[in-house]
């Protein structure tokens, strides 16, 4: 059996001087994202898609922003926790396709490192993870430079599914 999950996250930019973390990578920019955690929208979208694929709810259910235990937390920790939940159900990650949506900063110099972090955290080969970036041609909140969004599709399979 295989299943697919879709994840999405968006955050507005926060105060000047805060770090911008995307895919576990600190991306040079004058402002990071305002959030309860580290605001890593890419990790959040992938985590949300992973949980959704396994029928395990969503990011906010497992890691609520009302819980101080997650204040400022590295979102890679959340992804690894979600992976363990999914694996406990007999699933494994097949592949991930994720998109960052932002007018600025330029993401392309960093997508390789983001892909590598996601692959390591999901315990898959880098070839099983794709990260890309796009703009909205100056439309909507990302286009106006107000924040960044990310979306992801995650394919999972039952252990042994492709071994037949």
Swiss-Prot record:
Binds 1 divalent metal cation per subunit. It comes from Alkalilimnicola ehrlichii (strain ATCC BAA-1101 / DSM 17681 / MLHE-1). Its cofactor is a divalent metal cation. Keywords: Isoprene biosynthesis, Lyase, Metal-binding. Homotrimer. It catalyses: 4-CDP-2-C-methyl-D-erythritol 2-phosphate = 2-C-methyl-D-erythritol 2,4-cyclic diphosphate + CMP. 4-CDP-2-C-methyl-D-erythritol 2-phosphate binds at residues 9-11, 36-37, 58-60, 63-67, 134-137, 141, 144. This is 2-C-methyl-D-erythritol 2,4-cyclodiphosphate synthase. Pfam families: YgbB (PF02542).
């Amino acid at each position: 059996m295989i299943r697919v999950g879709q994840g999405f996250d968006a955050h507005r930019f926060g105060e000047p001087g805060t770090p911008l973390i995307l895919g576990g990578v600190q991306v040079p920019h004058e402002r990071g994202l305002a959030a309860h955690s580290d605001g890593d929208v890419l990790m959040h979208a992938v985590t949300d898609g992973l949980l959704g694929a396994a029928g395990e709810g969503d990011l906010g259910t497992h890691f609520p922003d009302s819980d101080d235990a997650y204040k400022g937390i590295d979102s890679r920790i959340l992804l690894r926790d979600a992976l363990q939940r999914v694996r406990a159900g007999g699933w494994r990650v097949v592949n991930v396709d994720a998109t960052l949506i932002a007018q600025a900063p330029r993401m392309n110099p960093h997508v390789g490192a983001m892909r590598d972090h996601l692959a390591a955290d999901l315990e898959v080969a880098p070839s099983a993870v794709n990260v890309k970036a796009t703009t909205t041609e100056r439309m909507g909140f990302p286009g106006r430079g107000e924040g960044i969004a990310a979306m992801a599709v995650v394919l999972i399979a039952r252990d042994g599914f492709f071994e037949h």
